[in-house]
Swiss-Prot record:
Stored InterPro entries: Bifun_inhib/LTP/seed_sf, Bifunc_inhib/LTP/seed_store, Plant_nsLTP
Record keywords, A-Z: Disulfide bond, Lipid-binding, Lipoprotein, Signal, Transport
Any Pfam family the entry gives: Tryp_alpha_amyl
UniProt GO MF annotations: lipid binding
Classification via SUPFAM superfamilies: Bifunctional inhibitor/lipid-transfer protein/seed storage 2S albumin (SSF47699)
Lipid positions (Cis-14-hydroxy-10,13-dioxo-7-heptadecenoic acid aspartate ester): 30
Domain of life: Eukaryota
Signal sequence extent: 1-24
Name recorded for this polypeptide: Non-specific lipid-transfer protein
Cystine crosslinks: 26-73, 36-50, 51-96, 71-110
Length: 113
């Protein structure tokens, strides 16, 4: 009984310890912006799903570290897109009603976002 009480106390103590925030990972970023793929390849849009993903990403990337992680992920994703239309990619935030304090490009310095 005493061992069980100690185990319960340990679980409660661990549950009370604040966890470090997990940085935004590229798999998550990719899943959010994947609906934008046809538009950044020159198709019509951006779609409602694309805008929802961009808005969600913007809302989740609150800290500078999160913004830098998301930026680096987006650069990597963009480099892998065949027939990337950079003008369409740059137009997504304003067309989706997302105000970014920087311009999206393949050459963006993510340490400055």
């Amino acid at each position: 009984a005493q061992v069980m009480l100690m185990a319960v106390a340990l679980v409660l103590m661990l549950a009370a310890v604040p966890r470090a925030a997990v940085a935004i990972d590229c798999g998550h970023v990719d899943s959010l912006v994947r609906p934008c793929l046809s538009y950044v390849q020159g198709g019509p849009g951006p779609s409602g799903q694309c805008c929802d993903g961009v808005k969600n990403l913007h809302n989740q990337a609150r800290s500078q570290s999160d913004r830098q992680s998301a930026c680096n992920c987006l650069k990597g994703i963009a480099r892998g897109i065949h027939n990337l239309n950079e003008d369409n990619a740059r137009s997504i935030p304003p067309k989706c009603g997302v105000n970014l304090p920087y311009t999206i490009s393949l050459n963006i310095d993510c340490s400055r976002v």
